[in-house]
């Protein structure tokens, strides 16, 4: 991860074949240089980025710098992807976990930037690293995903119901209520705003509620 002030950051994925190399100081230093280059690139895709001039030696490309590092490390390496995030009205925070195996960038809109806001957005980045939400809010879930999840949960509910003795089976309207409850629970687990905040003192506060509290 590389960051410029509060509003711009970049993250890169550079793969090695072994954990030994992944923890190597020379490799880590190179990955940081790649991230620094990704922070400044104007490239729209990986192919364009790899063709960029290597900041440390402009006579070479980023791709050629990788070839040089492979020769030093004596192991196959690859630059797999990069992302660059720039906040137009707010800040970008980063969080790196597991010795660099997981990296998260979070962009937040805010009119106020101070240490409390920076910490809050970084805490949200930590939340993403820990619980891997798929969407920001429930409104972001595509209809086809909703339909697929509903189909799966309905099949489970019907199977569970049919496995019961006939005199204990639930009527259709009860199954439908159960389905709504299960869907809501499922969506809360995959949507960042609705997830329980990992540092919630009461174990109940959602991420959205935490941010609302910080923003007061």
Residue ranges of model-derived segments:
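N-terminal assembly/interaction segments in proteins that build large macromolecular machines
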Residues: 1-216
């Amino acid at each position: 991860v590389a960051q410029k002030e509060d509003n711009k950051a970049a993250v890169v994925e550079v793969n090695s074949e072994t954990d030994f190399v992944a923890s190597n100081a020379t490799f880590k230093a190179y990955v940081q240089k790649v991230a620094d280059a990704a922070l400044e690139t104007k490239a729209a895709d990986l192919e364009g980025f790899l063709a960029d001039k290597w900041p440390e030696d402009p006579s070479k490309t980023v791709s050629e710098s990788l070839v040089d590092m492979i020769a030093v490390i004596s192991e196959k390496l690859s630059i797999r992807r990069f992302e660059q995030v720039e906040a137009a009205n707010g800040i970008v925070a980063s969080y790196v976990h597991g010795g660099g195996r997981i990296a998260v960038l979070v962009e937040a809109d805010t009119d106020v930037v101070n240490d409390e806001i920076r910490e809050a957005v970084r805490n949200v980045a930590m939340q993403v690293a820990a619980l891997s939400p798929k969407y920001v809010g429930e409104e972001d879930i595509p209809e086809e995903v909703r339909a697929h999840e509903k189909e799966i949960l309905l099949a489970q509910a019907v199977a569970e119901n049919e496995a019961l003795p006939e005199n204990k089976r639930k009527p259709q309207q009860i199954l439908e209520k159960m389905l709504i409850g299960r869907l809501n629970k499922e969506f809360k687990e995959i949507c960042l705003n609705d997830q329980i905040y990992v540092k919630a003192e009461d174990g109940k506060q959602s991420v959205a509620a935490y941010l609302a509290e910080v923003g007061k």
